A protein has these predicted regions:
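Structured non-transmembrane domains adjacent to transmembrane bundles in polytopic membrane proteins
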Residues: 45-67, 71-157, 374, 380-542, ...
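Membrane-embedded transmembrane helical bundles of large multi-pass transporters/channels
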Residues: 1-35, 134-375, 493-685
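Ser/Thr/Pro/Gly-rich low-complexity linker/stalk segments immediately outside membranes or between
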Residues: 36-41, 376-378
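Surface-exposed, low-hydrophobicity interaction/linker segments
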Residues: 35-37, 103-104
């Protein structure tokens, strides 16, 4: 490695030029990376609902209704005018209202009340709209402009459009505040006014490279777009700081050596620690790649790539930048702003055993509670009632109740069997209406007598389409039970020869997919990190202690919603399990490394105090940065999935930090005879 680092130092101007060019190209590439805000797009291709949607899109021109629009204080003629105007909007492929089910020229009082009130109630008209995915942003905005602020719209298309528009501005706000905080914390923890700017420059270069190289994926998820950069900032913060501090140490130890020689020495001495730290983080992130739910691989690959690029930046760009600016660092040198943590170290040495006991007591209940949460699986609850979308959804449900749309595809022909299926589906209490050939044209009416535009919506491409309106949420026990019942009913008449699609159906498949991912992802993350530690430490007990400490922090973090009676987004639950392990196990590794170093010259208790004093600044810098980034995400994101992921990140960072600085010392103290190599050691006081 020394030869490589010597070459980097000698060609530092070329390195700076290459990174400057790469940063410019990355900025240009970032704008071309597409972001997907539809959570259902990340279902595995082989999931039943995904297959059903693909078959339906191949056979029919119209998709599944994905928006409900409520207009207040309108008459029937005015509602019909609104229907025509909505249908004329570019991107709207279909609009359904009362006139599609009943003859609205007949007085409504003389018609079926349930049918009428599904579309028109208390002077409010409810339209069921199908919006094309490619044009949903423009179409949703146009519908909003048409109906005005006093009316309401909700549905999957609206949720996706709102997420798209809000996340961009919110991420920019989070990033700006995070950078200011990181600058503040770096000013406190470094001894040069120039050093924080150098560290931020290096981090900025790595983040730009990661964002630009996301172009290789073509499209990234909204989770990756929102969390990727700020997570990279938080987990990579200490790499550059560590290198610069090593450089300062080498210059102080060998005052006669040139800055170039000191930098090569600093790189050689810091490579092992930085690489081991980065490797465990990468492994934790890569565990997400095994998820069938494709947001996992999407986020895992992007984060792992980000850490790798941060490491590349630290070992190439930062040496060149530091050598270009070290004179500026010398001129702006100042006394440390933070006090010594010696007293804190001695305090921890006194309380470490009780804290270790407390953690042992918490292990089992926190594990059980973390696995007993109630979950949201889909996108239905991503926006709370404090948002415009949440308020609109509540208003529509208050007037017209809940609603979802399922689409059943069965082979064309055999209208007698279709009629039997329709009759059976009508017996399901939650099914409030069915639009199909046998329901609207009649099983005895030949196809050639049905108008072409109507026929094309119901029969096409060898399939007959039955559109079910159901009184159900898009997720929850009731919704999932309904999906199972509809599937079982259709299975009776078309055994393994049908397709079922819909928002609730996709959410059911999401539940199936991501719950199956849980054990696999967690075991791989834990096993891989444990294996890396086993290879690094060359002993069994210490890796067990380190991994168990961080896993307990994860259990405590995920147990908090259980005790507060809150629902958890299962996607956030899965992601944080791997991310918290990968991002915070470094704290435990650093602590154990320094403890082993101090044990060469100090007794057990003194080594604990010295270790706490030595590492508190370092782990607090990274831990507090990650916590602030997480809490900012939780406070600013209107998307409740991203907000919850942020809060998990913030709480998890602080819990991991607290355990490493309070309970882990007690475990190391107790396990000392088994983890410290037998040497002639000082006698304990």
């Amino acid at each position: 490695m020394k030869r490589f680092y010597t070459a980097i130092v000698r060609r530092r101007r070329l390195v700076l030029a290459v990174f400057a060019l790469a940063a410019v190209l990355s900025m240009a590439a970032t704008s071309r990376v597409q972001v997907d805000y539809d959570i259902n797009d990340y279902l595995p291709p082989e999931s039943p609902s995904t297959t059903a949607i693909e078959v339906m899109n191949g056979a029919f021109t119209g998709g599944i209704p994905n928006m409900r629009v409520m207009v207040r204080d309108v008459t029937v003629p005015q509602a019909l005018e609104y229907k025509e105007k909505i249908a004329a909007i570019d991107g709207v492929s279909a609009v359904a209202w009362l006139d599609d089910s009943l003859d609205v020229t007949v007085p409504l009082q003389m018609q079926d009340t349930a049918t009428v009130e599904s579309y028109y109630k208390d002077g409010c008209a409810l339209f069921t709209v199908t919006v094309e995915d490619e044009k949903r942003l423009e179409a949703v905005a146009a519908v909003r402009d048409l109906i005005g602020e006093g009316n309401a719209l909700e549905g999957a298309a609206v949720s996706t459009a709102v997420a798209t528009n809000s996340t961009v501005t919110e991420v920019a706000k989070i990033a700006a505040i995070a950078v200011v905080y990181v600058l503040f914390i770096l000013i406190l923890t470094t001894d040069s006014w120039a050093e924080p700017l150098l560290v931020l420059t290096g981090l900025g270069a790595a983040i730009l490279l990661n964002n630009g190289t996301n172009l290789i994926f073509g499209t990234i998820s909204f989770v990756t777009n929102a969390a990727g950069s700020i997570l990279q900032l938080a987990v990579s913060l200490d790499y550059s700081v560590f290198l610069i501090h090593r450089f300062a140490e080498c210059r102080a130890e060998t005052p006669g050596a040139s800055p170039e020689e000191c930098m090569v020495d600093a790189l050689c001495r810091s490579t092992g620690s930085i690489l081991s730290s980065g490797l465990t983080t990468v492994i934790g992130f890569l565990a997400l790649v095994l998820m069938q739910f494709q947001i996992g691989p999407d986020l895992g690959l992007a984060l792992a790539k980000g850490v790798v690029l941060s490491l590349v930046t630290v070992f190439t760009f930062m040496p060149a930048l530091t050598l270009a600016c070290y004179k500026w660092m010398d001129k702006t040198h100042h006394r440390p702003l933070l006090p010594s943590f010696d007293k804190f170290g001695r305090f921890v040495a006194r309380i470490m055993l009780p804290m270790a006991l407390v953690l042992v007591i918490l292990m089992v209940p926190s594990y059980l509670a973390s696995n007993s949460n109630q979950y949201y699986y889909g996108a239905a609850h991503m926006f709370g009632e404090n948002t415009r979308l949440g308020a609109d959804t509540a208003a529509i449900e208050e007037t017209f109740g809940r609603s979802d749309t399922y689409v059943v595809l069965v082979p064309e022909g055999d209208t007698a069997t279709q009629q039997k299926l329709s009759d059976a589906l009508h017996t399901i209490p939650e099914v409030t209406g069915i639009l199909s050939y046998v329901d609207n044209a009649g099983a005895s009416i030949p196809l050639e007598f049905v108008p072409g535009d109507t026929l094309g919506l119901l029969v096409s491409g060898g399939y007959t389409r039955m559109v079910l309106t159901v009184d159900a949420d898009t997720e929850g026990d009731g919704a999932f039970a309904l999906v199972e019942r509809v599937r079982a009913t259709v299975q009776q008449y078309y055994p393994d020869n049908y397709y079922l699609a819909g928002q609730g159906v996709s959410t059911y498949d999401l539940m199936d997919t991501i719950t199956a991912d849980m054990v696999k992802v967690n075991l791989l993350a834990i096993g891989a990190v444990f294996l890396i530690l086993l290879l690094m430490k060359r002993q069994l007990l210490l890796p067990i202690i380190l991994v168990l400490s961080i896993e307990t922090a994860i259990w405590i973090n995920l147990a908090i919603p259980y005790f507060r009676g809150q629902y958890v987004f299962y996607i956030a639950y899965l992601i944080i399990s791997s991310v918290q392990l990968g991002a915070t196990v470094d704290y435990a590794i650093l602590f154990s490394d320094r403890y082993q170093e101090f044990r060469e010259t100090l007794g057990r208790k003194e080594a604990v105090a010295a270790t706490v004093s030595a590492v508190t600044t370092s782990v607090s810098t990274t831990g507090s940065a990650m916590a602030v980034v997480g809490f900012l995400m939780g406070a600013i994101s209107t998307n409740q999935l991203l907000g919850q992921l942020g809060n998990f990140l913030g709480v998890g960072s602080l819990v991991s930090l607290a355990i490493v600085l309070s309970a882990l010392p007690g475990f190391l103290y107790l396990a000392d005879p088994l983890i410290i190599k037998k040497k002639k050691q000082p006698k304990e006081a």
